[in-house]
């Protein structure tokens, strides 16, 4: 299964992650048997399902769960799917490619099998993820799109042709998307069914804190502090944010700091957490450079959020006065991540910052 399904990699988040554990949102798994249900009784199964949610909420994990269950023949087994997971950057390459070549990359050396797969497009299940990392614009002019899955096309045309069902209209699409990208994709999608991932509810947040700290006095104190901070506790609906809050508050407790004084608001929790990464991950920074690079990082993050610009280029780094030493350090800390196939393009690992 690993040969055909090499996507169970460990997601990298900021920090050393020694204390990280993944606690799935139980309700997300409950969606699996319902993802392709008709919108109304006697209706047709949707051919396009958009799974939307905040960054880190679990969209990619759900996509991987679909792939895993498909590999075990437990996801709509009666459909005889042939499923493929694509990160949008795989589709949106700088060189022209055809959809059949994309499939061949997943199953190298199996041209006969690829031909057999493409002979039954109604059995294709395509999962598309990573729209926020696109470095080119989607095409919404139908006359510019293509029906031919054998034709070599620019990445933006190929992706837009798939999304619009101009190409492979019989195939079923599962699209993982953030709220901020919905308006970009919506004009292309044909009768999409929307599924929103809500993240942890209150009881699941409490359970996560208890699993992280154990049923200890320290854990009770941290949980009580977090629950009193309405904004901070609401942000904990995102699983990875919940972990970061736990990790950051634990650091403060271990240093003997009073949480109310050291973390008076939600922003201070994240600032202290990010600052704590520098002593262990950026020993080559002097105090002055440390401060300058951290200010540059904050400038970059604020500018990105204000302008809804998720892919950052060389000019953005220069404007924030981040030099190569700083960029390398932030890559090492997993605060920034280089986009695959794009030497000078980066994204924040977690947009919650």
What are these regions (language model features)?
Residues 1-353:
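Intracellular innate-immune signaling modules
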């Amino acid at each position: 299964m690993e040969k055909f399904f090499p996507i169970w990699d460990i997601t990298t988040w900021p920090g050393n992650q020694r204390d990280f554990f993944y606690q799935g949102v139980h309700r997300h798994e409950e969606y699996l048997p319902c993802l392709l249900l008709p919108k109304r009784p006697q209706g047709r199964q949707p051919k396009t399902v958009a799974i939307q949610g905040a960054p880190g909420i679990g969209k990619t994990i759900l996509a991987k769960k679909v792939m895993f269950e498909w590999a075990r023949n437990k996801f709509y087994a009666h459909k005889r799917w042939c499923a493929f997971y694509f990160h949008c950057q795989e589709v949106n390459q700088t060189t022209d490619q055809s959809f059949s070549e994309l499939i061949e990359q997943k199953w190298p050396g199996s041209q006969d099998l690829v031909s057999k797969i493409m002979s039954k497009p109604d059995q294709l299940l395509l999962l598309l993820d990573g729209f926020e990392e696109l470095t080119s614009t989607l095409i919404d002019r139908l006359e510019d799109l293509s029906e031919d899955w054998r034709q070599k096309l620019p990445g933006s045309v190929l992706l837009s042709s798939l999304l619009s069902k101009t190409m492979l209209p019989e195939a079923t699409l599962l699209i993982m998307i953030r709220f901020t990208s919905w308006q970009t994709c919506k004009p292309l999608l044909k009768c999409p069914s929307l599924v929103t991932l809500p993240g942890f509810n209150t009881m699941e947040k409490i359970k996560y804190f208890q699993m992280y700290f154990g049923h200890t006095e320290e854990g009770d104190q941290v949980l009580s502090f977090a629950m009193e901070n309405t904004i901070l506790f609401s942000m904990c609906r995102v699983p990875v944010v919940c972990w970061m809050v736990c990790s950051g508050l634990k650091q403060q407790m271990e240093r003997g700091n009073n949480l109310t004084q050291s973390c008076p608001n939600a922003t201070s929790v994240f600032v202290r957490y990010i600052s704590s990464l520098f002593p262990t991950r950026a020993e080559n920074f002097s105090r002055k450079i440390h401060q300058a690079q951290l200010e540059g990082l904050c400038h970059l993050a604020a500018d990105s959020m204000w302008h809804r610009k998720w892919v950052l280029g060389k000019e953005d780094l220069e404007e924030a006065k981040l030099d190569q030493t700083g960029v390398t350090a932030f890559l090492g800390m997993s605060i920034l991540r280089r986009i695959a196939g794009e030497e000078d393009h980066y994204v924040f690992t977690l947009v919650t910052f």
